[in-house]
Amino acid sequence: TRTSHDHMRERSARVNFGRQWLDKSILEIYREDIVRFRVLLSGDVQEDALALISTGQVPKLRSLQVHNSTVYRWNRPCYGISDNGKPHLRIENRVLPSGPTVLDEVANAALWLGCMVQMHDDVGDIRNKIGFEDVYDNFGKAAKFGIDSKFTWMFDQKIPVVELALKELIPRARKGLEMRNVHPDSISRYMDVIEERATEHMNGARWALRSYTKLKKETTEDEALTVLTYAMCVNEKSGIPVHKWKMPELKDLKEYRPSGLKVSEFMTTDLFTV
């Protein structure tokens, strides 16, 4: 009656961080995707890619595009053809959406892009500086502990994420943006947001958790979530970066109308039974 998993084929999650560093080219990722993941979507593709290449034309590789769209890597390479007819390879990553304001999102993008430019010159081949297993572990820590994480950095250095941001990442990002001739005022504006966020030890996730914990002590779960959502909408529209947001108060929401709630939205589920 018990199923043993010791000898079953290992399957990778379609939502994943990755398994190892790339060694030679992006083809390694596409090969892995084709081998490890079953086809979910298909269609009638008439294109003969090899024939097009032999005549100097650029294939759309529609089947590859569709299959790639069903595998959700943290950094996903996407093949496409630009409006000018030239093929390109772009990288989709999950850094940009973690605002919650537009200013925070652009600051995140500036930090990431600046670091990518400068670390190429400062570090070179990062595979010689840090193992993929440590990077994978850091990713898990960041997802679980956020701004309170402690990472394994290059050369096996242990460093809190705030210290890493202030001492390593932000200075490198500033230099990288300068190398790409970004206006000094823009560099200061966006890097100051990241620096203040680290100094204040506050980001979107931490603000939401602290706010919910505070409100939950003062009212029901439903009203706490309603006030929290309202506060997030108001703060987001203000354009003020998240590290400057105040903790929400119940009085911030002028009208709370729970009369239309379902039983499941206000009932208590934490019960003692005998």
Question: For the regions a protein language model found, what residue spans apply to each?
Answer:
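C-terminal, helix-dominated tail/subdomain
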Residues: 1-26, 135-202, 212-213
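Loop-rich catalytic cores of soluble enzymes, especially ATP-dependent carboxylate-amine ligases
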Residues: 1-97, 126-130
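Generic recognition of stable, solvent-exposed alpha-helical segments in well-folded globular domains
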Residues: 25, 66-69, 88, 103-114, ...
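Charged, well-structured binding/catalytic surfaces in domain cores that contact anionic ligands
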Residues: 83-88, 100-103, 240, 250
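A generic short alpha-helical patch detector that favors 3-5-residue windows
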Residues: 85, 165, 255-259
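C-terminal catalytic subdomain
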Residues: 89-160
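Alpha-helix C-capping/helix-to-loop hinge sites
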Residues: 96-99, 180, 269-270
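Tandem CBS (Cystathionine beta-synthase) repeat/Bateman regulatory domains
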Residues: 195-274
